[in-house]
Amino acid sequence: MYNMMETELKPPGPQQTSGGGGGNSTAAAAGGNQKNSPDRVKRPMNAFMVWSRGQRRKMAQENPKMHNSEISKRLGAEWKLLSETEKRPFIDEAKRLRALHMKEHPDYKYRPRRKTKTLMKKDKYTLPGGLLAPGGNSMASGVGVGAGLGAGVNQRMDSYAHMNGWSNGSYSMMQDQLGYPQHPGLNAHGAAQMQPMHRYDVSALQYNSMTSSQTYMNGSPTYSMSYSQQGTPGMALGSMGSVVKSEASSSPPVVTSSSHSRAPCQAGDLRDMISMYLPGAEVPEPAAPSRLHMSQHYQSGPVPGTAINGTLPLSHM
């Protein structure tokens, strides 16, 4: 067996010595590839390499289409299955080759190319990030999209802050108590239509609360009850009247007027119904006195089933 191994190992022996001592082959290798010139001295083979050298040739001849990596996997599995007695001659041969290599190349130091490969892989993975940093188009587009989304969210959150930012948060309480569903038409373009109405209602609410908060505090229950008794299609206004009654006794006037003026904006059919009696949201602030006249008109008429008519102050008539 040793003779067979020596015959197989004789061709690489002169190649290693010629690679280290022969000037022609070293010069040709250095001229062809200067980066690999210091790595021309190969490492001494270990026991597995000594054994797998002949086995690899056999397996490659038997399976010419098999990839080299698959051959290495199979050879590694077979090497693990070998016993120590079977591995012993290859281990001894590997020791002999290592001693010979140390004699021929006493100043040899193993420089693993694995580190350079891993660095190249890291550079490949980090290269797109580095390229994206100086390029302004992709970053600007990403920032623009993020800013646009952030602006839309901020606008919507601002409108919700106007809705729920009033004192005691009674609007959210009333919305939870009523629990009526929204119109399906508001799902797609509801947010775009609700924002100008919210902002207009805030200014109109401030105007109304400054001029006649007392009238709205006393008139809103009767006003909502009269709407519910006229046979309107939305039956939620009747429950809204009772809720507004309880809200009016415990909350300040501004909260009651806000709950009354904000509730019709929640559903599309309610908004269309109220537009027959009140001016639309596009009308400027001078439409607020007409709302007061409408509420006074409903206050003057008797409302059956309610005892609020006798207690309403009619000093403004």
Swiss-Prot record:
Disulfide bonds: none annotated. GO terms for biological process: adenohypophysis development; brain development; chromatin organization; endodermal cell fate specification; eye development; forebrain development; glial cell fate commitment; inner ear development. One of its GO terms (cellular component) is nucleus. POU5F1/OCT4, SOX2, MYC/c-Myc and KLF4 are the four Yamanaka factors. When combined, these factors are sufficient to reprogram differentiated cells to an embryonic-like state designated iPS (induced pluripotent stem) cells. iPS cells exhibit the morphology and growth properties of ES cells and express ES cell marker genes. CDD domains: HMG-box_SoxB. Its main location: nucleus. Residues 246-261 have a biased composition (Low complexity). The keyword Manganese does not apply. A motif (9aaTAD) lies at residues 272-280. Changing K42R: Loss of interaction with L3MBTL3. Loss of ubiquitination by the CRL4-DCAF5 E3 ubiquitin ligase complex. Loss of interaction with PHF20L1. Residues 41-109 bind DNA. Changing R74P: In MCOPS3; uncertain significance. The modification Phosphoserine is found at S251. There is a cross-link at K245 (Glycyl lysine isopeptide (Lys-Gly) (interchain with G-Cter in SUMO)). The 9aaTAD motif is a transactivation domain present in a large number of yeast and animal transcription factors. Interacts with ZSCAN10. Interacts with SOX3 and FGFR1. Interacts with GLIS1. Interacts with POU5F1; binds synergistically with POU5F1 to DNA. Interacts with DDX56. Interacts with L3MBTL3 and DCAF5; the interaction requires methylation at Lys-42 and is necessary to target SOX2 for ubiquitination by the CRL4-DCAF5 E3 ubiquitin ligase complex. Interacts with RCOR1/CoREST. Interacts with PHF20L1; the interaction requires methylation at Lys-42 and Lys-117 and protects SOX2 from degradation. Interacts with TRIM26; this interaction prevents ubiquitination by WWP2. Transcription factor that forms a trimeric complex with OCT4 on DNA and controls the expression of a number of genes involved in embryonic development such as YES1, FGF4, UTF1 and ZFP206. Binds to the proximal enhancer region of NANOG. Critical for early embryogenesis and for embryonic stem cell pluripotency. Downstream SRRT target that mediates the promotion of neural stem cell self-renewal. Keeps neural cells undifferentiated by counteracting the activity of proneural proteins and suppresses neuronal differentiation. May function as a switch in neuronal development. This is Transcription factor SOX-2. It comes from Homo sapiens (Human).
